[in-house]
Amino acid sequence: MSKSSYYAPHGGHPAQTELLTDRAMFTEAYAVIPKGVMRDIVTSHLPFWDNMRMWVIARPLSGFAETFSQYIVELAPNGGSDKPEQDPNAEAVLFVVEGELSLTLQGQVHAMQPGGYAFIPPGADYKVRNTTGQYTRFHWIRKHYQKVDGVPLPEAFVTNEQDIQPLVMPDTEGRWSTTRFVDMSDMRHDMHVNIVNFEPGGVIPFAETHVMEHGLYVLEGKAVYRLNQDWVEVEAGDFMWLRAFCPQACYSGGPGRFRYLLYKDVNRHMRLTLNAPH
């Protein structure tokens, strides 16, 4: 497996001499948040956290993508929280893109490196801390877990993408693969957070149009991505946010790999009332 890279924003502030024209856009079907707009002045903070800031790149939004939130969290040395989550119904995935994250999950300590992935079920006891002298940056994806009578809660686990063999899509000669952290047939899970990998020349050869909402954070490389009726150039550090049924396709022209972290909601009946809880 090729050595992977993981883009992480560092903030900063543009000079007064820079042009304000950028690729940022928000439409009725999708949004593109390019890396150039993730600056210091748009960060947020949370109660019970020390030495942290975060970029909120997705949140439940009525009439758009409604099922998940996604943060990019930056921890300064000694930053973290002993009480990171206040919602007892929230499940989460943590994915480390820079530095080292010390995760204490149900009493067990894990030193998570870049590529590190943790699934945290609702109600789980956990703490996060940056115990190093360098900055740590990670994605925190949260969803209200949809319980089903007779289906147990999924178990917590911690792994690293380097320990998982990507599954190659058929008839692609290895140019399109997916690193899956959860078995697709495991009905305990109502969301998947995967990594999609394209080698140069790899494509999504049709306009995917489906019910699953998406958050796509580009970890590495660049490509041209079709969103609804638009072809958009994207690169490492960009985020694409798609509502249900937004058509999408991709062409990865190189010169290197194109990879993104992908959220989608799965394995549950569709709600039949608009204001029912997710």
What are these regions (language model features)?
Residues G107-P122, Q229-A244:
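Short acidic-glycine-tyrosine-enriched beta hairpin
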Residues S4, L101, G107, G116-R129:
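N-terminal intrinsically disordered, low-complexity, charge/repeat-rich segments that act as generic
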